[in-house]
Amino acid sequence: MNNYDKTMRFNLDDVPKENVKSVLTNVYNTLKERGYDPVNQIVGYLLSGDPAYIPRHNEARNQIRRIDRDEIMEELVSNYLNASKDN
């Protein structure tokens, strides 16, 4: 039996999860480097889900698409609330 005839299993646990902070930092820096307003572009992506808001440069688009938008928003809100609690 040929290896191509077997059903392969894919385990998401084997794929390293992207660190939300490092991805957002890269996306932010890439947007700034390209002359965009990073906050507006990221918000546009989060609200619409349209990856066209994020450039392909520096793998920014590929990186941010690997993370669920809900997970990004959860991280942003959590960090915002924790930061405002400290002030």
UniProtKB/Swiss-Prot annotation:
Disulfide partners: none
Family annotation (InterPro entries): IreB
Classification via NCBIfam families: PRK05473.1
Record family assignment: Belongs to the UPF0297 family.
Protein name listed in UniProt: UPF0297 protein Sca_1229
Organism, scientific name: Staphylococcus carnosus (strain TM300)
